């Protein structure tokens, strides 16, 4: 029930099952060994200061009387602690409705990401932001839906961890970015063209090509969920903007300054 490995553990579990299903039982031992090793050695993010309120929020989840999900605007500017507290207060709302609300928040954060933050060079480790920080919120949301609809008892943990992502990525928005500019008029054609592009992506780093692939597939599944309502449109628009923007990977000055700052802490 804790926040494990920045959400990667939850993402890997259904994907490992899918991989074994497609490739056959013969690949099960190495795939499962890798999965178990990653779970055993993964970090508990609920123990770091940024997410330290997770345990309390999980304990108090659903004890409030508010049975309606908070609006998208209610999450605006909330840090992880406040985003989790708001989610827990509304924990008696139907899980699917609360999920749609949190998906909309994470999708909105990604859609409105201020690209000027890609040029930040004086930020300490962990505080700089890039596209992968935001796309991870959607791929994690996809995994939450996959597992929590199968194991409903996991909804509180999954929803609160979505709130962690929402709060962590708050405050990096560009107010000039609006939904209408990035809405996709023909989703079916859009996904067909993007899938074809992914087969000839031209990316030199596997981490970029793989993240693009899993984000496209996650948004495709999320868009097909009728119960998430307008959140699906926001997620699709966010993906459209991501694919229309460059994914800068080399941050030489940022890396150098972060390294010097890190070393100075020990001198």
Language model features: what each stretch is:
Residues 1-267:
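Mature, well-folded catalytic/scaffold domains that follow N-terminal targeting or propeptide regions
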